[in-house]
Design a protein with these regions (language model features):
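Conserved beta-hairpin
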Residues: 53-71
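C-terminal "cap" of GNAT-fold acetyltransferases
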Residues: 4-7, 154-167
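Short amphipathic alpha-helix that is part of the acyltransferase structural core
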Residues: 2-42, 59-64
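Conserved acetyl-CoA-binding loop-helix of GNAT-fold acetyltransferases
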Residues: 99, 105-118
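Conserved GNAT acetyl-CoA-binding A-motif
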Residues: 120-133
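A short, internal acetyl-CoA/4′-phosphopantetheine-binding micro-motif in the GNAT/acyltransferase core
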Residues: 95-104, 133-134
Length: 167
């Protein structure tokens, strides 16, 4: 993709067209362990029903990226989400961001974050997320620090570890 190529960032919900939902699911699976594994498209739909702000990135009629976010009142059962729910009275939690490997380094991730930064600013919300430290996702850690995120905690799970970030 050339820098001047046009991609579109589109908001979506759990009622998204099935073919687009499938593309998001497969992109998610291609990006594990950087994002959490989903057992099925149905699990993705359940995730979307609980979420608040979701965007996909489309280029030449294919989804090349997406972002799924939650607000503080969700019933989302993620331990990482619950970390922030205990610490913040209100917040916007970035659960997952995935960009097709071919389309990385074109500013897509940054533009997705710009979308939610305006929502966060208009609602006086911190943006919260976690990034893997084991296995190490150094690119994502650097990306978030460059965007102004700071570390607010860490957690070691049985099969991986994360750093918690806030902006």
């Amino acid at each position: 993709m050339k820098k001047e190529s046009k991609y579109i960032i589109q908001e979506f919900s759990s009622s998204i067209e099935q073919s687009l939902l499938e593309q998001i699911y497969f992109l998610n699976q291609e990006n594990t362990p950087e994002v959490g594994d989903l057992s099925s498209i149905k699990e993705l739909q359940n995730l979307l029903r609980q979420s608040s702000n979701n965007y996909y990135v489309i280029f030449k009629n294919r989804i090349i990226g997406f972002m799924i976010c939650f607000r503080e009142k969700s019933d989302y059962n993620s331990k990482n989400y619950k970390f922030f729910k205990k610490k913040e009275s209100k917040f916007l939690y970035v659960d997952r961001v995935a960009i097709n490997e071919k389309y990385r380094r074109f500013g897509i991730g940054k533009n997705l974050y710009l979308k939610i930064e305006s929502i966060a600013a208009n609602n006086d919300l911190p943006i919260c997320c976690e990034v893997n430290t084991d296995p190490l996702n150094e690119i994502s850690i650097r990306f978030h620090k460059d965007l102004g995120f700071t570390e607010v905690g860490k957690c070691k799970f049985d099969n991986h570890s994360v750093v918690y970030l806030r902006k």
